């Protein structure tokens, strides 16, 4: 089975849920950018989150850009997505390697302390730009936080 995003709503549209399977997307990114395992996981999380956030956009011409700029060795990461499920991404240092931490890839140390930016271009004169400090640098937690605090009002 290929990649997909599932959307669900409840309470008359007041509650929305999204889930995604993106193994093919992440594998393609790994091959195209010749990424290390830690870069693959980090960019994979951002690609998946960006794809789900892009699916929330209303018009086919809308574009969402998510950027992480941290002080860790992975450098910056950028993902662009749209409501049609088209997504692409870039990682500053695709060859980054760090020792395992408690037997797991250390995404937080690879990303470091930094800022998560969400740019929504919905065809107005200026795009909406929201910046927030990374909370955990694990990417998924940070995307969840920015979605909850900033994007629900827009």
Q: Which residues does each predicted region cover?
A:
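Flexible, glycine/proline-enriched loop segments at strand-loop-helix junctions
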Residues: 36-37, 126-136
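Short, structured patches in soluble enzyme cores that scaffold and shape functional sites
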Residues: 70, 120, 132-136, 147
